[in-house]
Design a protein with these regions (language model features):
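Membrane-interface "cap" regions at the ends of multi-pass membrane proteins
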Residues: 1-30, 86, 157, 193, ...
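Flexible loop linkers connecting adjacent transmembrane helices
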Residues: 2, 34-39, 62-87, 139-146, ...
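Juxtamembrane transmembrane-helix boundary signature
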Residues: 22, 49-82, 91-97
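Helix-loop-helix module between adjacent transmembrane segments
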Residues: 56-61, 86-106, 114-140, 199-200, ...
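Extracellular/periplasmic helix-exit of transmembrane alpha-helices
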Residues: 57-70, 214-229, 252-280
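Loop-to-transmembrane helix boundary motifs in multi-pass membrane proteins
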Residues: 86-88, 123-126, 292-294, 298, ...
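Transmembrane alpha-helical segments of multi-pass small-molecule transport proteins
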Residues: 92-96, 117-139, 157-162, 327-343, ...
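Hydrophobic alpha-helical segments and their helix-loop junctions in multi-pass secondary transporters
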Residues: 156-182, 191-212, 373-381, 406-418
Length: 419
């Protein structure tokens, strides 16, 4: 490796990190439930759905990050600048509902993990998850963005090891994996499961947040003066290159985790009953592969809940600030957003049912995040020379159309009782 390559790499490393925080949204408890269900019911059939979803996510997250870097503003802030006050409030309300639904899934997932590991009652598990996430947010709130990112990356490593460990005990079938790369379905139910997988993968709050993360990270690493002079210094091209690398590696890891969960279920749980809940999947994994693998799986679920609920609260704060120009202390927001999840846990609602409801709410919110993102990144008056090319516009809108159509289909099937 030449000295020049070494210097470039040395300069590149400090710019990496935001995508790994956003990637946590792609390995939250909702993904665990969707991917385990897909593998247990249909074996390797829907591997292609996860592969396509991951490619879609890479494009969407890059556009969000590019929007933030080029404009210096987050997606919510840009929308807030272009909307009337009533429109801003209405948009904020739907975004907050989506944020609450996201938090619901993540807190419940973490509480379930504590219950599986230590027998902690679900309500108290939710309280513990909320308290730990608040501690993580204190780090971020004190301006220690790099430390916050390091903690989240550490949790992402635990998630990866926890969810993929079972594959060493029950290796998937290579021919099954190859067969799963061929796009096809097996009846209407498999379409519903595929829509659920896609809905659990592309998360609205990750789209909103990434455009803010890149600016917070740059200001923390390089200082506000460097961040503000990005255009005049020619720094932007290097930032965008670093962002593409950041997203590629972060979402490749997230995609590997999601596909690994499906492969684990296909190899060890196919045809077994009771695996359509996280508790049932844990029991089946422990029974089929041994209690150690079951414990490691639960540890991965715990890390997933802790990381994703912290990132979700961070996203909610940025959404409110961008749309309403109001910055409520993030710990106050964390307390308020925790209440719905604790009420549901305290009421004794079935956790998997709550996860399903939360995924439907997320499906409603996806078009409101993706369509404005595509429109803004295509406008030269917003993006200048970095506006999407015709090819990227076509690809972006095609991805948006597929995601929105599948999520609306999921909502329809769920509301009509067919899901």
């Amino acid at each position: 490796m030449s000295v020049t390559d070494s210097e470039h790499r040395h300069k590149l490393i400090p710019l990496l990190g935001p995508a790994f925080v956003a990637a946590v949204a792609y390995v939250d408890p909702g993904n665990v439930a969707a991917n385990i269900t897909a593998g247990a019911r249909y074996g390797y059939l829907l591997v292609w759905v996860l592969l396509a979803s991951n490619i879609f996510a890479m494009v969407i997250q890059y556009l969000s990050a590019k929007l933030g870097l080029v404009t210096g503003k987050s997606l919510p802030a840009l929308l807030g600048d272009r909307m009337s006050k009533p429109a801003r409030i209405a948009f904020w309300i739907q975004a907050e509902i989506v944020a609450a639904a996201t938090d619901l899934a993540e807190v419940i997932g973490g509480a379930l993990a504590l219950h599986l590991l230590f027998g902690v009652p679900l309500l108290w598990g939710g309280v513990i998850i909320g308290a730990v996430s608040m501690a993580l947010l204190v780090v971020q709130g004190e301006g220690k963005q790099r430390q916050f990112e390091t903690i989240i990356v550490g949790l992402l490593i635990i998630i990866t090891l926890g969810f993929l460990a079972g594959l060493f005990v029950a290796p998937p079938s290579p021919s099954g994996i190859l067969g799963g790369l061929l796009p096809r379905f097996q009846g209407t139910d498999s379409v519903l499961v595929a829509a659920s997988m896609l809905g659990a993968t592309v998360m609205p709050h990750a789209v909103y947040l990434h455009s803010s993360l890149v600016n917070d990270h740059e200001a923390d690493e390089l200082g506000p003066s460097t961040a503000d002079s990005r255009h005049s210094s020619g720094h932007l091209s290097r930032l965008l290159r670093a962002t593409r690398i950041d997203i590629y590696w972060a979402l490749s890891i997230a995609g590997l985790v999601n596909i690994g969960l499906l492969l684990l279920a296909a190899a060890a749980l196919a045809g077994q009953s009771g695996t359509d809940t996280i508790e049932g999947a844990h029991t089946a994994i422990s029974s089929a592969l041994g209690p150690l693998v079951g414990t490691v799986f639960a540890v991965g679920l715990l890390a997933s809940g802790l990381a994703s609920t912290s990132v979700g609260a961070y996203a909610g704060s940025e959404i409110m600030n961008g749309l309403l120009h109001v910055r409520v202390p993030i710990l106050v927001r964390r307390l308020v957003s925790l209440i719905p999840a604790l009420i549901i846990l305290g009421a004794g609602a079935e956790p998997t049912w709550a996860l399903v409801v939360s995924q439907v709410a997320l499906s409603f919110g996806i078009p409101f995040a993706i369509i404005p993102l595509m429109r803004l990144t295509a406008k030269r008056e917003v993006m200048g020379e970095y506006a999407n090319t015709r090819t990227l516009r076509a690809v972006g809108f095609a991805i948006a159309a597929v995601i929105v159509a599948l999520n609306l289909f999921l909502v329809y099937l769920t509301l009509t009782g067919q899901g």
